[in-house]
Amino acid sequence: MREKQSTIVNCGSLARTLWALDEARLRGQPATGAGVREALDWVTSRFGGEGAYRGLLCAPTTEDLRARLAVPTGEDASLGRGGAAHILGEEAVRALSLWRREEGWEREQVVRSIRDEFRTLAGRPGHFCCLRCSVARWRALTAARPDGWEDILRDGLQLLGERTIDKSGRWRGYPFYYTLLALSETPLAEVDKERRRVRAAAERVLERQQEADIVGRFRRRALEWATAR
């Protein structure tokens, strides 16, 4: 019997492929499965390609650059070509790290680069060029875990804690669902303080959060973590 054709890789969009890979991982699909393996091969083939951030990370597709990029939880991330390339590049590092994919890309060089760049840009190791890009890099570092990643994340959490909470109960400036999703994956005790700060806001939207599409499923996952006691 022929194996079912992959529904994970989308050669027109790195973003869609990465989000589908994450859902496959959460469903427990094996890395050795044909669909997952094909998608991982395609992602690794794009490292250092045309349009890659700093010529090093995973290159977005033409569709990714033309469309309004959204992170997996749906918040707008259309920050121009450089911003899209950066966020998707970080998300690709995260995906390959979580799938424990070593071959096909210069893992040590790439991970060392994102760690060291985080340490030197903007004067704070936990902040990158903007808040959305910062969260993307937190996710990549949490998955890849290079030396010193905990210190970088702790600084990021400190910066998050310095943000005031708006009238809706959310952090000012940070993408709410995307940040929650990042914190839910961060194995540091400091995340609990931030979870408590926004728990009431998460509880208000959880009961009406639908799971009709991939964005809804990622949002619900983040909200369920935020409201857990």
Tell where the protein language model's regions lie, with residue ranges.
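Preference for long, amphipathic alpha-helical scaffolds in soluble/luminal domains
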Residues: 1-229
